[in-house]
Amino acid sequence: GAYIACPDPIDFRAFTVVDDFSRECPTIHVDTSIGGLRVVRLLEELRATRGFPRTVVCDNGPEFTSRAFLTWAEERGIEIRFIQPGKPTQNAFIESFNGRLREECLETHWFTSLRHAREVIEAWRVDYNEVRPHSSIGDRTPAEFAAQFRSEAA
């Protein structure tokens, strides 16, 4: 996950989650503030459709070093792998994803409200998952790749 600060007429943050295997982005949560408890709630919501991850790779932001997040992960046996400060390449998938999000969506829109930001960012996320093929997964969309993997694993 990552936490992107987005100055505009409104100040908001975007919490992003990317599956390193499928390249899918199951959620981008947009709000004025996103703390450790909110991150835990978001990951619990994802559990219903995706299960829990074995590992979470994240930076050392306060939402990831919070007691709520660390306790949640420990109770579920989830490994937390913190990247070293100043070494974003240790979390290359999310850094690449966040760069695309910033360049293709955040820097090309002037958001007038939190609702507007959420709508535009969600449309971008759907396009990223369902329309855009990725060379790293055989020129399939992340949604196609994940669906194929699930059917082969069944």
Segments predicted by a language model, with ranges:
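Charged DNA-binding/catalytic regions of mobile-element recombinases
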Residues: 1-154
